Design a protein with these regions (language model features):
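Contiguous interface-forming segments/domains that mediate binding rather than catalysis
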Residues: 16, 20, 29-204
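N-terminal signal peptide c-region/cleavage motif recognized by signal peptidases
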Residues: 25-26
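Short, charged low-complexity linear motifs
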Residues: 2, 20-21
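Bacterial N-terminal signal peptides that target proteins for export
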Residues: 3-16
Length: 204
């Protein structure tokens, strides 16, 4: 019969506890993340941040818990000991994770020139992927360094070159997507400036 010494037993117990703690921490990280939702201003989100130049679209602060989006309430905010920059930093990491899962489709004209990129997904955070710090760089080779983005619905993003007016040619499509969606976001066109959204106006 083999016996384990008291010291070896203590070390084994300590190793198991460290492993369980690490596993629990990882589980919590994956299950509870911060997110910034690009949302229409008519939604009654209590904790929101403005988007420069926009009166119809906001960034709503939310948690993603076990895959479920839970907008932050004022009551919940009282128990969250984090500043907005701290929440934003984690939310941008969430946006990056979402963007990595996206597969943009490039739409070309009859001469095979890229007109715009379309991102569509069932992920409810699809529109928020534009906040990923690496978003603009991912399209620089195809659409140039200056981008325009439209997010007519929670599940759709259209990316254009700022040097073209392709977004105007698609205005009717963008508006129709917004009006017919169960989860509309915005009928505005935005620029991405240093990772921040700025509204250029509403498509008519």
């Amino acid at each position: 019969m083999h016996f384990i010494s008291t010291r070896a037993h203590a070390e084994l117990k300590r190793a198991i506890l460290v492993f369980l703690f690490a596993a629990a921490s990882t589980s919590t990280l994956l299950a509870d993340q911060w997110a910034l939702l690009v949302e229409p201003s008519f939604m009654d989100h209590k904790m929101r941040r403005p988007i420069e130049g926009s009166q119809r679209t906001v960034l709503a602060i939310a948690r993603v818990v076990d895959g479920e989006i839970q907008p932050l309430t004022r009551e919940e905010k009282k128990s969250v000991h984090m500043t907005y920059p701290m929440i934003q930093e984690q939310a941008l990491q969430t946006a990056s994770e979402v963007f990595k899962r996206m597969k943009p489709t490039f739409v070309r004209d009859k001469n095979q020139v890229i007109q715009y990129a379309a991102i569509e997904s069932e992920d409810p955070l699809t529109a928020s992927c534009v906040l990923a710090p690496e978003f603009a760089a991912a399209f620089e080779e195809t659409l140039g360094p200056d981008l325009l983005v439209a997010m007519p619905t929670r599940n759709q993003v259209l990316v254009f070159s700022k040097q073209d007016n392709a977004h105007l040619r698609l205005a009717e499509k963008i508006i129709n997507s917004y009006l017919t969606s169960n989860y509309p976001v915005s009928r505005e066109i935005f620029t991405l400036e240093s990772g921040n959204l700025r509204s250029l106006g509403i498509l008519e």
